[in-house]
Amino acid sequence: MEGIILAAGKGTRMKSDLPKVVHEVAEKPMVLRVYEALVGAGVKRVVAVVGYRKEKVEEILRGRAVIAVQEEQLGTGHAALVAMPYVEDENVIIVPGDTPLLKASTLQALIKKHLETGAYATVLTCFLSNPYGYGRIVRDGYGKIIKIVEEKDATLEEKQIAEVNTGIYCFNTKILKEILPLLKAENAQKEYYLTDVIPLLLERGKVVETITIQDETEVYGVNDRVQLARLTKGVYRRKAEALMQEGVTIIDPETVYIGEEVVVGSDTVIYPNTYLEGKTVIGSGCRLGPNTRITDSVIGNNTEITFSVIIQARVGDEVNVGPFAYLRPGTEIANGVKIGDFVEIKKSFIGEGSKVPHLSYIGDAVVGKGVNIGAGTITCNYDGKNKWETVIEDGAFIGSNTNLVAPIKIGKNAVVGAGSTLTEDVPEKALAIARSRQVNKEDYVK
């Protein structure tokens, strides 16, 4: 079985310069979601029909799908015709590029029905409480499908039909190649409809089957930003429910946003307005949020992160982060560390049991075990041309309001006096003070 993705349309109601299918639903372009569903269903080769700003779709599917170009967007039937020279298998499945919630299991069921019945076409249908905008499935008195009529071409009686066409089909490739050139644009849109293949097949006595999907949300399309937001919410809701079934507590599933590739351990509690993105892995027994964003990071067990942003970092077990901390790419935090309020850490290692409690910037640094870094400490890592490393060894104590001008090394168990600006290394167990002496002028105020 080979597949065709219809991805040529502009999507006028999206009010965008981008093709509709490249808009993202929960971190992933719609057309990529459809492609992955096809591959997950066992489709061995995919042809994507592109048109409006085709290079944007090609960027996403390059190396994945064969690209067929529809220079003029003349309807779904014409798009399928454009793809036909690239289809080699006996059967083909055709899917719109704007159905991002579609499951591979649904496509598998459609393919199975098509192959087992030997039908020339099999249509995936669905019953909707509000079928407005969808093509209706018209059946005869015996329940056999006789045609699919689009909303704009339907009679008042046909508009009362609740069973709709999802726009997803399996076809016998040979007969489809024969029928597509016969389509006519005799409709309100003056387009060539793929749906018109069905009555032409029936006229020739060819078997047409249907299979009905139960979960209507899978086949929801996207025509505007409102629908895009609704489907995005659906993806996040599906992920949240799956995690809750696996032992994760989510205080308010409507206000958390967890990507599909995110892994979360049991007994973790997630508070509102928390974003877990990319390939993030969260351990067990953690407390995340509220108002926290974690992207492409690994978090250990029993760690608490609140009101903070963590991007491409690794955080160990029993770590406390926040509120208002920012861990930037390349940061690694060992077990038992405290990263407090208004602390920014960039491309640094913080050793086990160390503390950076307040108002500090730690960049391009290696911090050992059991180090205490006082409020207002800055690693001055950039000289205007290059970034330099700061090393703070085990047990060191850095006083508040200290500037460490890199490259610099603070030895084991050394102490740095508050208010110092250091430009030279500090030996082990030494006290370093680099500030002016205090002078009190008696009777200064008259």
UniProtKB/Swiss-Prot annotation:
Residues 226-246 are annotated as: Linker. Keywords: Acyltransferase, Cell shape, Cell wall biogenesis/degradation, Cytoplasm, Magnesium, Metal-binding, Multifunctional enzyme, Nucleotidyltransferase, Peptidoglycan synthesis, Repeat, Transferase. Acetyl-CoA binds at A375, N381, Y382, S400, A418, R435. Its EC number is 2.7.7.23, 2.3.1.157. It catalyses: alpha-D-glucosamine 1-phosphate + acetyl-CoA = N-acetyl-alpha-D-glucosamine 1-phosphate + CoA + H(+); N-acetyl-alpha-D-glucosamine 1-phosphate + UTP + H(+) = UDP-N-acetyl-alpha-D-glucosamine + diphosphate. Residues 247-446 are annotated as: N-acetyltransferase. Gene3D superfamilies: Hexapeptide repeat proteins, Spore Coat Polysaccharide Biosynthesis Protein SpsA, Chain A. Mg(2+) binds at D98, N223. GO terms for cellular component: cytoplasm; membrane. The active site is at H358 (proton acceptor). Residues 1-225 are annotated as: Pyrophosphorylase. InterPro entries: Bifunctional_GlmU, GlmU-like, GlmU_C_LbH, Hexapep, Hexapep_transf_CS, NTP_transferase_dom, Nucleotide-diphossugar_trans, Trimer_LpxA-like_sf. GO terms for biological process: cell morphogenesis; cell wall organization; lipid A biosynthetic process; peptidoglycan biosynthetic process; regulation of cell shape; UDP-N-acetylglucosamine biosynthetic process. Disulfide bonds: none annotated. Its cofactor is Mg(2+). The keyword Membrane does not apply. One of its GO terms (molecular function) is magnesium ion binding. Pathway: Nucleotide-sugar biosynthesis; UDP-N-acetyl-alpha-D-glucosamine biosynthesis; N-acetyl-alpha-D-glucosamine 1-phosphate from alpha-D-glucosamine 6-phosphate (route II): step 2/2; Nucleotide-sugar biosynthesis; UDP-N-acetyl-alpha-D-glucosamine biosynthesis; UDP-N-acetyl-alpha-D-glucosamine from N-acetyl-alpha-D-glucosamine 1-phosphate: step 1/1; Bacterial outer membrane biogenesis; LPS lipid A biosynthesis. Binds 1 Mg(2+) ion per subunit. It is found in: Cytoplasm. In the N-terminal section; belongs to the N-acetylglucosamine-1-phosphate uridyltransferase family. Homotrimer. Catalyzes the last two sequential reactions in the de novo biosynthetic pathway for UDP-N-acetylglucosamine (UDP-GlcNAc). The C-terminal domain catalyzes the transfer of acetyl group from acetyl coenzyme A to glucosamine-1-phosphate (GlcN-1-P) to produce N-acetylglucosamine-1-phosphate (GlcNAc-1-P), which is converted into UDP-GlcNAc by the transfer of uridine 5-monophosphate (from uridine 5-triphosphate), a reaction catalyzed by the N-terminal domain. This is Bifunctional protein GlmU. It comes from Carboxydothermus hydrogenoformans (strain ATCC BAA-161 / DSM 6008 / Z-2901).
